[in-house]
UniProtKB/Swiss-Prot annotation:
One Pfam family, short name: Peptidase_M48
Enzyme class: hydrolase
GO cellular component: plasma membrane
Residues at the active site: E166
Protein name: Protease HtpX homolog
Gene (UniProt): htpX
Length: 322
């Protein structure tokens, strides 16, 4: 397996990040237009034919454009400034001080110096299972997080391979790409959940006010449209997540000149990757191996279309042939 040059990979991921940033508001706009069309089709009696329906749809959509732009900007601003704290809370991570574990700091510093990289922050998850992940969107927020179990159960060469894997995610800028994709998917998930909860609440009060029937229809349409966006955005996110693991494995092998050490580490990680605190699927894909029960059956159904990680056996086999 040949590793793509660092400059090439950075350029590709920067381009993909830009495409996602453009695609996100475009998809929101398309789905908003679909919602407007369905809403008018089901709620307005059209005596003038299809032309009038489209004209009303266009007018409603134009009126909503400022809200679309404002919503997208607010969502990304919030995500930009809060992604690190949200991920830390979702994984149960905390800062690891140098005095707690000089060994980890020495390994990270040596690898960073060999690559001319700025030292990232280091966090630890107090869990005896074996896992790790990288996060952040710039040099001020880049972080390598290791579980207590992976620190205690891997030797220095294996741990160096894992750290190199996470540093490759940072160096290639695919951490930023993945977080953008997580934000991209998150808004559709949020909208679908809001609509679903609203429909449930409205159904309880429907008998008190027959006018609620129209409101429920609007919410159902919103939920359907949001679910469509969530489905396609999730497929895109999974595809990005799977490919980045292969690239990070290859980058770590190149960085350490010891692919067998990372292969050995992955074999140990696969035996116990479950991190108890991790419940969110979008956060789970950040890890070197899926930290939940799905890690053992990630490729079941649809040939792995919905898998966040490639088969770890395949990753090990590639490293052993590197």
């Amino acid at each position: 397996m040949q590793y793509v040059g660092i400059q090439t990979q950075q350029s590709r991921n920067n381009l993909r990040s830009g495409i996602l940033l453009i695609l996100f508001p475009c998809l929101v706009a398309v789905l908003t237009y679909l919602f407007c069309y369905l809403l008018i089709t089901f709620t307005v009696e059209d005596d003038y034919g299809q032309y009038n329906t489209l004209a009303m749809t266009n007018q409603m959509f134009i009126n909503l454009i400022p809200y679309i732009i404002g919503g997208v900007l607010v969502w990304f601003i919030i995500a930009y400034f809060t992604n690190s704290s949200i991920i830390k809370a979702a994984t149960g991570a905390r800062p690891l001080e140098r005095k707690e574990n000089k060994r980890i700091y020495n390994l990270v510093e040596n690898l960073c110096m060999s690559q001319g990289m700025k030292m990232p922050k280091i966090n630890i998850i107090d869990d005896d299972s074996l896992n790790a992940y990288a996060s952040g969107i710039n040099e001020q927020t880049y972080t390598v997080t290791l579980s207590k179990g992976i620190i205690e159960k891997l030797n220095d060469e294996e741990l160096e391979g894992v750290i190199a894997h996470e540093l490759t995610h940072i160096r290639n800028h695919d951490v930023r790409l993945l977080i953008i994709s997580i934000v991209f998917v998150g808004i559709f998930s949020m909208l679908a959940q809001i609509a679903l909860r609203s429909v449930y609440y409205s159904s309880w009060t429907r008998s008190r006010n027959d006018k609620n029937n129209g409101a429920i229809l609007i919410l159902v349409l919103a939920m359907i449209v949001a679910a469509i966006g969530y489905f396609f955005a999730t497929l895109m996110r999974f595809a990005i997540s799977r490919k980045r693991e292969y690239m990070a494995d290859a980058g770590a092998a190149e960085m350490t000149k010891n692919p067998l050490a990372l292969a050995s580490a992955l074999r140990k990680i696969s035996a116990d990757p479950d991190i108890e605190a991790v419940e969110r699927e979008d956060v789970a894909q950040l890890f070197i191996q899926h930290p939940g029960k799905q890690a053992k059956s990630a490729l079941s159904g649809l040939s792995g279309l919905f898998a966040t990680h490639p088969p770890i056996e395949k990753r090990i086999a590639i490293l052993e042939q590197f």
